[in-house]
Amino acid sequence: MIYEATGRYHRDMEGVLDTAGHALVKVNPARARRFAQAAGYGAKTDRVDAAMRERMGAVLDLDARPVRSDCMHEIRELHVARIGLVKDRTACRNRLHGARNKIVLTQLRARLRQVETQIEQIDAELHRLIADDAGLAHRFGILVSIPGIGPVAAITMIVEMPELGSMDGKQAASLAGLAPITRESGKWKGKSRIGGGRRSLRRALYMPALVAIRHNAQLGQVYTTLCSAGKPAKLAITAVMRKLLLLANALIRDGRKWTETAP
């Protein structure tokens, strides 16, 4: 059964249909609309949308994915709330630099303390939920064993890519938008670029990649080799991000923690 993601509104439907044993395929609304335009579906009605999604599923051979558990829904909601609070904290700190009025300063400091307390509360609840779920706790333990990946990055990877460990390296890189996209036609060859995929996951892997370059000999060598070959530092960091993701995928697939000799 194919349906479009509609935020919280499709969660009850997912639960009922999953319990009934239906295979579910959730598609991004933007991707569905692009397919509709390419296939010549100009009108947009419930009947047209249903026919379009049926055709989309047949043409693209979309794979069904397991429905998120109630625990994962809670973790995702907390994760999204934490992202918003981190942005609020940054905004408060920036405003504090320019504030001079005593009332404004007092309010900003109080708001900053409140935000930091709320972040701590969310972090504690996230760790509790993960610790109470044996499967998630196992995945979390594997991820934080990798040099560079801390608790926040590990939770982001669990939330943004629950498929980790169930796919091959190419699929993982493609889903994260870290697979180079070749651009060539005839004799013309453009520069390969990354794009698409899950942007929030790429953002979460950036700082871990920088740490891994310093503390993981294998990934540090990848960075050094590319830079020595004249590649831009940004490209080398992206390559490390991709290697880091592939390493996490392989370790979760094999059910083992990172060691110095891990591939």
Give the predicted meaning of each segment.
Residues 1-263:
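A detector of single, family-specific signature residues
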